């Protein structure tokens, strides 16, 4: 059953917080797709939309609504409670909740999105946290930093990316400073703008295991993963730019993916993962995958 804001207010703050992006996912924040439509958000969506006529792409609102509902049902079938930011007709891309905030052990961080159609997504994100009784720990004020560029690699170790087109170096460094004040180890690395966010390049699957597009990272970043003891399942460049690595770890060797990720899904199954793959074409063509479309509010601590 879906959990709405009126239900969330009955929960205590002790129920919230994320110390790792692995472990059993219990609560997830999604956007409502009521006003979703295609707008040029990034290089992926801009190219897709520029090729609509030649490639036969066509936005289908009812299909998008069905696909989003399928995602909700997949979460619920895996025991995840679903929460929502409210739909707003002026914010057609707020369905991609990964970017407007991210959760920490101390509360939420409200981000600063650079893309003009999304600059006010912070309004519905911050409203959700206020209504839910979840503290807002920080607001990004230096440059821009978006939640898709924040990866907790392991407890107290965070990876942050910036492309310049979306997150900026000064925004990433502001977040880095907050975490270092809390005693965390941090690593900031630039990524090519065609990948948009770090979560198109690196997604944690299980403790010390990640999907990684090594072609998108400098060699010193690969060395950093080695030093952290992170095993990597490599996603080829061609799959990565189609959001092939943009999956959601549900914990317990379970993954939510998209059906067009044929190669990645096959590899994950060969590695013993239970893969729930949904058709998410309307949103992927619009610039975001299933990982872009969610934000974890609570995970059980690994181990």
Where are these regions (language model features)?
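The feature marks the mature, well-folded catalytic cores of soluble enzymes
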Residues: 1-303
């Amino acid at each position: 059953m879906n959990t709405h804001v009126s239900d969330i207010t009955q929960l205590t703050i002790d129920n919230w917080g994320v110390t790792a992006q692995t472990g059993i996912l219990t609560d997830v924040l999604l956007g409502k797709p009521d006003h979703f439509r295609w707008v040029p958000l990034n290089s992926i969506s801009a190219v897709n939309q520029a090729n609509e006529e030649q490639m036969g792409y066509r936005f289908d609102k009812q299909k998008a609504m069905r696909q989003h509902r399928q995602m909700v049902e997949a979460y619920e079938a895996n025991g995840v409670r679903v929460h929502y930011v409210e739909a707003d007709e002026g914010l057609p891309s707020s369905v991609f909740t990964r970017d407007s905030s991210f959760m920490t052990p101390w509360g939420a961080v409200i981000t600063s999105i650079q893309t003009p159609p999304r600059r006010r997504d912070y309004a519905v994100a911050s409203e959700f946290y206020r209504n839910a009784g979840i503290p807002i720990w920080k607001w990004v004020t230096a440059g821009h930093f978006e939640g898709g560029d924040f990866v907790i690699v392991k407890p107290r170790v965070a990876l942050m990316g910036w492309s310049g087109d979306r997150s900026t170096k000064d925004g990433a460094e502001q977040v880095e400073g907050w975490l270092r004040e809390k005693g965390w180890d941090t690593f900031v690395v630039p990524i090519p703008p065609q990948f948009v966010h770090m979560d198109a390049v690196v997604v944690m699957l299980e403790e010390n295991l990640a999907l990684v597009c090594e072609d998108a990272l400098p060699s010193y970043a690969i060395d950093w993963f080695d030093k952290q003891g992170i095993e990597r399942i490599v996603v080829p460049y061609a799959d990565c730019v189609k959001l092939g690595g943009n999956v959601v770890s549900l914990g317990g060797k379970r993954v939510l993916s998209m059906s067009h990720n044929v190669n990645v899904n096959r590899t994950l199954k060969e590695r013993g993962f239970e893969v729930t793959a949904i058709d998410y074409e309307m949103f992927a063509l619009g610039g975001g995958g299933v990982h872009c479309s969610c934000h974890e509010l609570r995970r059980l601590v690994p181990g």
